[in-house]
Amino acid sequence: MSHAIDELQAIIADLKTELETEPKSSGGVASNSRLARDRIDRMSAEVVDSNPYSRLMALQRMNIVKDYERIRYKAVAIVGVGGVGSVTADMLTRCGIGKLILFDYDKVELANMNRLFFTPDQAGLSKVAAAAATLSFINPDVEIETHNYNITTVENFDRFLDTISQGGRIAGQPVDLVLSCVDNFEARMAINAACNERNLNWFESGVSENAVSGHIQFIRPGDTACFACAPPLVVAENIDEKTLKREGVCAASLPTTMGITAGFLVQNALKYLLNFGEVSDYLGYNALSDFFPKMTLKPNPQCDDRNCLVRQKEFQARPKPVLIEEKAVSEEPLHATNEWGIELVAEDAPESNTTPAETPVMGEGLRLAYEAPEKSSETSEETVSAATADETSLEDLMAQMKSM
């Protein structure tokens, strides 16, 4: 018995040694034993189980997207890889985006497990490193670039500005779209300032502290209101955000609300990048009543961001597109009086003398089963005379009966 116990202890010791000496991945955790698929050079529409893009390329066959493979030449920057940002990155990776640039300086915690995407074994890792490892395994065709710093500091803001200005799919070109998935006002203002300065279109997104509402907002510098044009109530009233949170009480979060908000964000990002459908300028979501408000916010002529004012002037100076109205071809009415061809005839109107219809020309061997007799004018006069005679005789008869 003791010999068996010694053998088991020796096996356990060997397993511990093996785990300690196992090679580590770049994220600091034991490398995943699962094998990632090989990279794919071109997207294929071939319908086979081994093609990860077959269902995406089907959008072309259904005339939703003209050329879906263009997505491989697009670069998107995601700022904030939390509840909304991580799911957004996951969806874009599965859609086959060409390049993802992730910004975040926070770490994965067990408190994040109520959200989607991250797993408990990633606790303690930086969010961008954990996300990059998972996303690369999901789709190795996507180029993923990570930046683990706070973009709101003066030094890091310049780095952020350079990255979104020159980090496109083609070196030296700007990214195609910036997605804001942050949870604080300072970071949103930093993204807003950078995009106004570089004239980049971007989406702002957010989920409320009570976790039952969310929104996305598409911001086109100069065309729609930037984030500084209509600041939230917290800033408009000069209230510190920290004073709104009671001590010991944290903001609530639901994976459902965050997943819905991320879905709206990615759906509209795809419509913008691939040029199909209608991109919503502002789309909200209220989970309590399933209410989805939509609106467009115009820029503020007195905006505090000077670059926003410059973009407004540039937008106003652009030539307005000329809309050519197509004149509808109106068909002439079937009847001069009404379009239904109905003609009203008074009851006391005299009957028109209609000529009998001509006998249609019949084919050889065919004949009419019935021919209506023609009414002559003499027959009509005789009928009227007979009726008059009958009426007179009846009156005489009545007079005779009364005299009896």
Swiss-Prot record:
Q: Mutating residue 333 to S: what's the consequence?
A: In strain: ZBMEL384
Q: What happens when the gene is disrupted?
A: RNAi-mediated knockdown shows aberrant neuromuscular junctions in the larval muscle and abnormal wings, locomotive defects and a shortened lifespan in the adult fly. RNAi-mediated knockdown in the nervous system results also in aberrant neuromuscular junctions characterized by reduced number of type Ib boutons and increased bouton size in the larval muscle. RNAi-mediated knockdown in adult neuronal tissue results in reduced adult lifespan and progressive locomoter defects due to neurodegeneration, when in combination with knockdown of Ufl1; brains show evidence of increased ER stress.
Binding-site positions, Zn(2+): 226, 229, 303, 308
Domain of life, per UniProt, equals: Eukaryota
* Keywords attached to this entry: ATP-binding, Cytoplasm, Golgi apparatus, Metal-binding, Nucleotide-binding, Nucleus, Ubl conjugation pathway, Zinc
Q: Which CDD domains match?
A: ThiF_MoeB_HesA_family
A GO cellular component annotated for this chain's UniProt record is: Golgi apparatus
Active-site residues? 250
- UniProt cross-references to InterPro entries, sorted A to Z: D-isomer_DH_CS1, ThiF/MoeB/HesA, ThiF_NAD_FAD-bd, Ubiquitin-activating_enz
Its localization reads:
Cytoplasm; Nucleus; Golgi apparatus
Main localisation: cytoplasm
Positions with a binding annotation for ATP: 83, 104, 127, 150, 184
Q: Which residues form a coiled coil?
A: none
- Please give the family membership noted in the entry: Belongs to the ubiquitin-activating E1 family. UBA5 subfamily.
* PANTHER family per record: UBIQUITIN-ACTIVATING ENZYME E1, UBIQUITIN-LIKE MODIFIER-ACTIVATING ENZYME 5
Q: What does this protein do?
A: E1-like enzyme which activates UFM1.
Spell out the protein name for this chain.
Answer: Ubiquitin-like modifier-activating enzyme 5
Q: Which species is this record about?
A: Drosophila melanogaster (Fruit fly)
Q: What is the lineage of its organism?
A: Eukaryota, Metazoa, Ecdysozoa, Arthropoda, Hexapoda
Q: Which gene encodes it?
A: Uba5
